UniProtKB/Swiss-Prot annotation:
This is L-lactate dehydrogenase. The keyword NAD applies. Substrate binds at residues 88, 94, 126-129, 154-157, 235. It comes from Oceanobacillus iheyensis (strain DSM 14371 / CIP 107618 / JCM 11309 / KCTC 3954 / HTE831). Belongs to the LDH/MDH superfamily. LDH family. The modification Phosphotyrosine is found at residue 226.
Length: 321
């Protein structure tokens, strides 16, 4: 991995589908990286995307060098972002995808590591928590250098919904979704704040605000992907923007707190699972996992989410051996 003193950052994107190309487009528009290589099985389509992106250089904030990549380009990459894999179909849960995508990932990670890659993996493909942990196993890299998108998008969705409800900017709402990026995720209402005011206190400002509305807000967040998939076939803009946010935090050594899928080694009383939790992200990847206090009900829900992921990951990895 390159050091922070070097001027040129390189991101390699593997998987030029809707999520991957949206990520590439957002990277260029925000000027986050100087180099971007795109690898995809459909080389012609990927080359078309490269051409299309390069034609917009004159309008970008910085001149990102974009090219059709190969696995050898991973050797000098700071980040390899994997967006490849089977898509989630209507009526299919993220966990239903695990067997399809685990096999795809084993081949991809082997090819990346054979290049001499020594950077950070950023995983977007679902089920993201399970595949993030699989990449740790397949790559042999230390866990702090393998990061999943986790519940970064879910947290952004929650802040958006709360912002709409309270007529406030989502940037001033500090509330997290943690757990599986999926059906067992949970909101941390007990520690959520608006500005510096506890969310549950803020509710008392008006009789038009109710705790029952919070349940509806969370349901909207949890089920958002299903609704979007039903209407347009896939989600990609929101997750692409969340991936760019994590990429920026890494490349700029920000030490920002994001709810990535991170490997727990005793935090929250849990071992050996990747799951969405507030995490300090910097140039080295995961710097620290923040242990947010939970009430009894939240802890119970979180433990259920952990067990759900373990119940899928462990038998699936046994099948891969």
């Amino acid at each position: 991995m390159r050091t922070s003193q070097q001027a040129v950052n390189r991101v390699v994107l593997i998987g030029g589908g809707s999520v991957g190309v949206s990520y590439a487009f957002a990277l260029m528009n925000q000027g986050v990286t100087e180099e971007l290589a795109i690898i995809d099985l459909d080389a012609d389509k990927a080359l078309g995307d490269v051409m299309d992106l390069n034609h917009g250089k004159a309008f970008a904030p910085s001149l990102t060098n974009v090219w059709l990549g190969e696995y050898g380009d991973c050797k000098d990459a700071d980040i390899v972002c994997i967006c490849a894999g089977a898509n989630q179909q209507s009526g299919e849960t993220r966990l239903d995808l695990v067997e399809k995508n685990m096999k795809i990932f084993k081949e991809i990670v082997t090819d990346v590591m054979n290049s001499g890659f020594n950077g950070i993996f950023l995983i977007a493909t679902n089920p993201v928590d399970i595949l993030t942990q699989a990449v740790i196993s397949f790559s042999g890299l230390p866990p702090h250098r393998v990061i999943g998108s986790g519940t970064t998008l879910d947290t952004a969705r929650l802040r958006y919904e709360l912002g709409e409800y309270f007529h406030l900017s989502p940037k001033n709402i500090h509330a997290y979704i943690i757990g599986e990026h999926g059906d067992t995720e949970l909101p941390l209402w007990s520690t959520a704040t608006i500005g510096t005011v506890p969310l549950l206190t803020y509710l008392n400002r008006s009789e038009s605000y109710t705790t029952e509305d919070l349940d509806d807000i969370f349901t909207n967040v949890r089920d958002a992907a299903y609704r979007i998939i039903q209407k347009k076939g896939a989600t990609y803009y929101g997750i692409a923007m969340s991936l760019v946010r994590v990429t920026e935090a890494i490349l700029k050594d920000e030490h920002s707190i994001l709810t990535t899928s991170s490997f727990l080694q005793g935090e929250y009383g849990v071992d050996n699972v990747c799951i969405g939790v507030p995490t300090i992200i910097n140039r080295n990847g995961v710097s620290e996992i923040i242990e947010v206090p939970m009430n009894e009900d939240e802890q119970k829900q979180f433990n259920h989410s952990v067990q759900t992921l373990k119940g899928i990951y462990e038998p699936t990895m046994q099948m891969m051996k």
